[in-house]
Regions:
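Conserved phosphate-binding/catalytic region of the ribokinase-like
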Residues: 2-3, 55-168
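Conserved beta-alpha-beta core of the PfkB/ribokinase-like small-molecule kinase fold
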Residues: 1-63, 82
């Protein structure tokens, strides 16, 4: 992580918490805290936000994370079909999820969301993002994540950019 930071890389973290895989949830919390302390960009699900902060209110939970981990430049909170919220330098941008039906399974949706966010940030950078930029980022990421849920299998279900744009 130190080498990546020194090289100017954007560091991202998605805890992808799976409680049954941990013998001790406090150890999971400690490891997630370590990851959050290392990264610039965090993707946190609604359930993970509750686990980490005790907050059901997304704004309050994100504020706690940003206060606790000042290195975080962007916190993206995802809530499945309900949509996602991006918190960046005092901005709060909500983008509704895509709810066209046809969901088969949700495997890979969060990973797809993350990949789209990271692609956007690699193209646009982390500095001077606007609310419109964040809206564009979330809109594309939500649409791509939705498309993954309409297909079986995480890897082969990843949509091409043109497929996402056609949905939008």
């Amino acid at each position: 992580m130190a080498l990546a930071r020194a090289a100017g890389c954007i560091l991202s973290f998605d805890p992808n918490l799976r409680p049954p895989l941990w013998d001790d949830l406090e150890q999971a919390r400690d490891q997630i805290h370590w990851g959050l302390a290392q990264c610039d960009v965090a993707k946190i699900s609604d359930d993970e936000l509750l686990f980490l902060t005790g907050e059901t209110d997304f704004d309050a939970g994100a504020a706690k994370l940003i206060a606790q981990f000042p290195n975080l430049q962007i916190v993206n909170v995802t809530a499945g079909a309900q949509g996602s919220i991006s918190y960046y330098q005092g901005l709060r941008v909500f983008q509704p999820g895509v709810t066209l039906g046809g969901v088969i399974e949700t495997t890979g949706a969060g990973d797809t969301f993350c990949a789209c966010v990271l692609n956007f940030l690699l193209e646009h950078g982390l500095e001077h993002l606007t609310a419109d930029d964040l809206t564009q980022m979330l809109r594309f990421a939500n649409a791509a994540a939705y498309l993954v849920t309409t297909r079986r299998g995480a890897i082969r279900s990843m949509p091409e950019p043109e497929q996402v744009l056609a949905l939008l």
